[in-house]
Amino acid sequence: MIDGGRFGRILAINTFNYTDFMYRPRRDEELRTVDGGGVLFSQGAHQFDIVRLLAGGPVSEVYASTGRWDRERDTEISYQAMIRFINGVVAQCTYSGFARFDSDELMEWVGETGYEKDPGDYGNSRRALVDLTRDGELSAKRSRTFGASKLPTVAPSNEHFGPLIIQCERADLRVGPREISVYTDFEKEVVPVPLVKGPREPVFRALYDAVRFGTQPIQSGRWCLGTLEVCHAVIESAADGRPVYLNRS
């Protein structure tokens, strides 16, 4: 829709995601920033991939703050990042894994992988940790890792990463799990989005096409270095209280 030019160039992006990420069972290294723990390298990378792809240009500047709010889980639990691109686009990115407000409430209670969530489950993540020893938490983590359970083949909605609003010259676009809402000067249009075959299917398809057919993926090694640079810039900016200027991403 953006590449088609109907709505003009992108002006700004706003995206946020409030989850229970840091209060799910975690391994020791997932609670240490130096080992890639916290929300930035695991979750921020997804969010920064999204805005970089949409903005369509390299990042020039990052100004950010982070939250380390729990001594028992002493790593980045949240961040707020203002990202400027060399083409003039500005993206405001927020992520919180503090396990209180759940932004899926604003996504019709559709979870990140496209399956419906029960709002009555509020507080379950923190509650499950209350009586767990460290060994118990590690055991619980092993039971949740990749391949430990089988997801249904088709989700009723598409995957998402929280509310996402894109402002263009001639319209605002709000991306939801089932549709894209287009807000022009005088009317609103809702464009249905086709379902993918299953959770993570586009990721596995990109990997298969790269290996089997030599198709260049969007998220190449060079691309991922750019996203990693943004993650480190968020930490540096938050620590120093100043913008960080980039040259790779």
Predicted feature residues:
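Predominantly a Rossmann-like dinucleotide-binding segment in NAD(P)-dependent oxidoreductases
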Residues: 1-93, 97-114, 241
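A general structural signal for short secondary-structure boundary/capping elements
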Residues: 6, 30-31, 58-61, 88, ...
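A generic structural signal for residues located within well-ordered alpha-helices
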Residues: 43-46, 199, 226
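C-terminal helix-rich "cap/oligomerization" subdomain common to oxidoreductases
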Residues: 135-138, 142, 147-148, 154-157, ...
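A short local loop/turn or secondary-structure capping micro-motif enriched for an aromatic residue
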Residues: 99-103, 182-185, 199-200
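Short coil/turn segments
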Residues: 18, 195-200
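Contiguous C-terminal substrate-recognition/catalytic subdomains in enzyme active sites
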Residues: 97-165
